[in-house]
Structure formats: C-alpha cells, structure tokens
Amino acid sequence: MSESKVSIAPASERVAHTCSLVDSVTRLRYVNANRAEALERLGILRVRDLLLNVPHRYLDFSHRVQIAFAQIGEDATITGRVASVKTKRPRPKMVIIEIEVVDDTGVLTASFFRQPWIAEQIHVDDEVALSGKVLFAYGYRQMKSPFYEVLSTAKSDSNDEARSKETPSKAAILPVHPATEGVSPAWMRRIMSAALADTGSVCDWLPSELVTKHHLMSLSSALREVHFPSSLDAAEQARRRLAFDELLSLQLALLARRNLELAGHRPFEHVIDGPKVKALIEALPFALTDEQNHAAQEILSDMTAPRIMNRLLLGDVGTGKTAVAAVALAAAADSSTQAAVMAPTSVLAQQYAQKIGPLLSLAGITWALITGSTSEEERQQIELCLADGSLSVVFGTTALLSDRMVFKQLTLAVVDEQHRFGVDQRTALRKKGQGVDLLAMSATPIPRTLALSLYGDVDTSRITKRPKAGAGVTTKLCVPENLDQAYAAISEAVQAGHQAYLVCPLIDPSDSEEELEDVPEAVRTNGKLYSATRVYEELSKTVFKDFTCDLLTGRLPEAQKDQVMEKFRANKTQILVSTTVIEVGVDVPNATVMVVFNADRFGLATLHQLRGRVGRGDFPGTVYLASNAKRGSIARKRLAALEQTSDGARLAELDLELRHEGETLGYRQSGGTTLKISDLYADADLIEAAHMDALAITAQDPNLTSDAYATLGIEAKDRFGIYFEELGYK
C-alpha cells in the first residue's frame, strides 16, 4: 500500500462503473468520506485491498434454527426481530451493548463487549441474524459476542442514502467480513458487490500452467465465490485459490530476499576438521548423541559447501543445541575467521557466554561478551580485538549491529530465537562480513509448514531427544482463588533448599489498567492483571516474608539485571519475581517451582519455554498455571494441552490447529508480512506446493522480470514489499 491517507475522488469519478484493482476505493459506488476512513482502519485503500479482504466466516441460513430449539452449548444461527438495544457501562473503559432478539418461539439476548458502535448499527425492529454458541442464564438463551448480520433495517442511515430500507438477503450463505466502526458486515457485502461489478473480469496474475497443475479456480471466479459463494465448498475452493496466491507470493519474496542478501558474495570454505574443533569436542563434559552429532555434521557440511549456509537448528529445551553451535564456532576459529552469536536478551547472551565461553577457552579460542551493560573501556578493547582479528568469537545482543562493531573477517553468524529479530536485523548482522553463513537456532519447535512460511528456503536440523532430561516437570492448572496450594509448594521447596519463580504478564500496576485484547474467549483473571512489581511488594512482605525475594523485569538497567540473575544463580535469592525476561536461556538447576499468573495471557511458546526453567537438575519441577479461563474455551484448551504433554513438537501442532492463523507458538510475521488468507494448519499442502513452485520459478527467473513471471513478481512485491525494497520493482 503506497498511499498513507485516503483522498476522496470527485463524485463523477466515483460513480464510474469500471475501475482497476489499483484504483482507490473512493472510485467505487457508496464509498463516501466516512466509509473511506473506516475502510482505511481495516488497511483497505485500494480496490484490490478490498477484494482480498476475504470473509472470516459464513452464515449458513439453510441450517438456521428457531430460538426455542437452539441447543444449549452448541453453535447455532438464528434470525429474529430486535426488541431492545441497551448500552451498559459496568466500569470505566468497558462498554457492553446488549440486544434482545425475538422470534415466534422465544427470546435470546446477545452481548457485545467493547464494541460501542454496534448500538449505531443495530436498531429496534431491525431483522438480524446471529451466529454463535448458545448459553443459558437468568432464564434466557444468550450469546456472547456472536457474529451478526442486519438483514433488514427499520431506520435509515444518514451517512449512506442507499442503506435505507434494505430488503432481507435471499442468499442461503452470507459472508461475514472483518468489521470495524462504521463498516458493518452488511455494508461490506454491498460494497464488495459493487467492486466486483465495477472491476469485471480481472487479469489473472498466476501463470495458467500453475492454475491447471493445482486444479485452481480462475482469479475472477475465486473472487466472486469467496465473497458470494454458491456453496460452502465453492467458498473453500475459492479461499484456497487466493491462499495459494498469497503463499506463492511469500515464497517468492523470501527467496528474492535471500538472493539479494547473498548477491555478489561467495561462500567461505571453512576448515571443519581442524585442531580447535577436535579440542572443543574433547572439552565437552559429555559425548555428543547421535542426533547432536548428525546436526553438527550437517552444519559443518554446509560450512564447506559451494552455497552460503542458511540453516535452522530446532531443539526443545535441554536437547543440546548449544553444544552443537559451539562446534560451528570452533570451525570458524580453525579457519582463522570470526563468528558472532546474537541473542534477543542480555540475560540469554550472558548465559551463552557462561556456557560456551569456558569450552572455547579450553579449545584455545578467544571470545568476549558485549551487551548494553558493557563498560566503555571494555567495549573499546573488544572493538579493537575484533578489528585486528585477535578475537575469534563474540557473544551479544543487538549491540553487535552497532556501526562501531567492525570485524576483520566475519564468516559465521549464529542467531538464537531468530523469530524475535526482524528481517533487517538479521540482514544487518550478515552485512558485517562477506558471504556470511547463517545458523539460526530456536528452542520453539515449529512444523515444517510454519518454517517455510517464516524463512522460505531454509535447511532444517532437528534434535528431538534430551540427553539429560532432568527430573521432569509437572504442569498444573489452578484458579487464582486456589493459589495457596502453589504458595505452599514454593515454601516447602525453599525450605528444602530449592528456589522458585513467580511470573507476571505486566511490569507495573499502572500497566494493568489496560483492557483485555478483543480476542475470542479472552477473560480477565479475578478482574485484574498481575504485575511483577505489585506481586513482589505484596508477597515479599506477607506470604514469603521469611524468604529472600528479588525482582527482575525488562525495564531494569542491564547491569542491575545481571546482578539480580547472578544472585539467583548463586542461591542468594530464593524467590525471583519476574516477567517473561526469564523465558529463554536462564539455567538454574536448583529452581523447582514456578507460578505463572494470568497464564491465559501468554502464548503456548512462552509458557512452554517458561516451564523449561524448572526441573532442570536432579529434582522434579512443578509449574502452576493460574487462570480463570472457562472450560471449553480456546484459552483453556491451550492450557490443558500444556498440562497433558511436554512434547514441544506436539504442542506446536496443537497450537497451530487451535489457532488456525498465521501465528503459532509465539511466531508472528513482522511488518508487512502477515498472512491474511492462508491457514497454516489447513493449507499445509499449499505451503509445500508454493515452496516447490517458487524454487522452480526463481531457478528460471531469479529476478522475476521475464514475460512469463513479471506480473507474478509485481504481485509478490505488492503483498510483501518489505522483502523487495532493494530489488527495484516498480
């Protein structure tokens, strides 16, 4: 989207019955200034943005039921007349719109939370359709935040002369598009119809051979069927066609970006069987397992290949990724070049230095750690040693990206928890050298389909078994009212000489004034959100007054963070109250108990990583997930999955299945790369197909400029421009 603000075209232009996909939506009928601003809030500026804004749900009126016969606890679609519309304000910043809908058999109440504009869209005597889970309370059937559609209205809309006295839709299947204030699903359906009529038959950007190969709809048919389906099956086939377009564009963008990163750079052929590699392996306190050795050999093989390495090393907590990465660092040292290890937090960077540093020293490899707390004198010394080549390995955070950090010859970049860094940050680290091999690591196991959607052309190594699993962790769900049990477990553990964590979603009490996100099934735990500072102040003076407590948050100065963690590692602190700053990398084997407040506020990845902080030694760990998430809710199902399994790979699949969206286990594509149509769970086959097609296309036409693929290249650039910013497409 190149425009930043909407400009309204003259009326004579807006009533034109023909327009192109790149035209502003203001050329369409019915789009006045207010509607244009409302569409802009949905990210819709052009006609193509509108047509690719696909419905997130369909109301199937062939299966609607009367109110009295709607089954409690089941999803249902009902229609009826609005008998009343009420606005309630139970507390500041909380608005609830409550409507009563009646039909010949009974009454149903529907409540909408934090959507005040609904009172302007639904009026008394309107005929509406509601779709959602049927509940029962106070003698009435109820729905909470259901999908709704105004089928006919009793009140004209002064903002839109065409709305007055709409007639009920005769369609058996109605699309429900994402809505915002000023844009109801009903109005979206009308403007979508106008857009399809005004654009006519659009030119297909997908080569015809791919349409035939994958048995896809034409683009024009897909746009018609996804918005006004003849059947639910046709709607799904249309969505899959548009999803394939999106996924192929993403794969082409990822490959183009990688080709750009590596353009003009020759891979460096590392020495992989030198004395430092052998010395480091001998210095390890354990023998590499078959899986670890296999992963190490894959990495070393890449480091001598005629292609610059782009490898992702996946392994759950405790699988030994660190040892494998250390072998690669030693290979760079054997080659008389340099390696950089970049971690997302100073705590994790320090952890790597403490774990790997002594092994490197035993192998005769020089190394240093640089973070935000590094003194200026020490920083200058590190910079000098990097510049003259006397320093082989450096550990750090994004401080490594500073212009002051100049390497004599950087040939290996190791990036931990790569999804936490933006594309530009990873590229910036690689630009510190020529033909730099990239090894990305993650303790968050992700399905191959997600790896492809995040990284594109990436080789993957997986370590699935823990050589030293520790005593294990038991995960328990509890409601906040029963936290006494968790506190008792902490007291017992500390008295036995162990340590504990208390993890909160927020830092300060003032942050807890924020409202919950508008997501399905979100709940407010006990009417409040727990903050680390409040929990520390209250519990350290009451329940845990006889123990030594400390506080760790991301807002502390780097030096203070290091000091707090060092005291905890030395068992000078018995209970650590923190935020998710301890999520990855913190290794304190003596910690055995953890309580996570407002657990439903965290992603599965974060919770899985957090519980990996306990039970790492010879004593079993216990994690209490405190939440008021309702039984049957998505939040409760996700927490129950953690209670039932410790298999990270299985959790990744479960999370993908539950979410059905472009984010799983904490991974969210950044900036302009979010998937809007594709379902990473349902479209696994399309992701694989798009990846293979993208490889074949870029092999023939790397820059996507030939007659066969120029249109496709422009489409990919339009969707994922962040990856093409330096490729010169217009």
List each language-model region with its residue ranges.
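Intrinsically disordered, low-complexity N-terminal extensions of nucleic-acid-metabolism proteins
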Residues: 1-18, 74-89, 94
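OB-fold nucleic-acid-binding modules
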Residues: 53-77, 82-83
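N-terminal cationic and glycine-rich segments that engage phosphates or anionic surfaces
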Residues: 144-146, 153-154, 428-430, 440, ...
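Upstream accessory/linker segments immediately N-terminal to the RecA-like ATPase cores of bacterial MutS
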Residues: 35, 88-283
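Inter-lobe coupling/hinge segments of SF2-like helicase ATPases
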Residues: 262, 294-297, 307-640, 703, ...
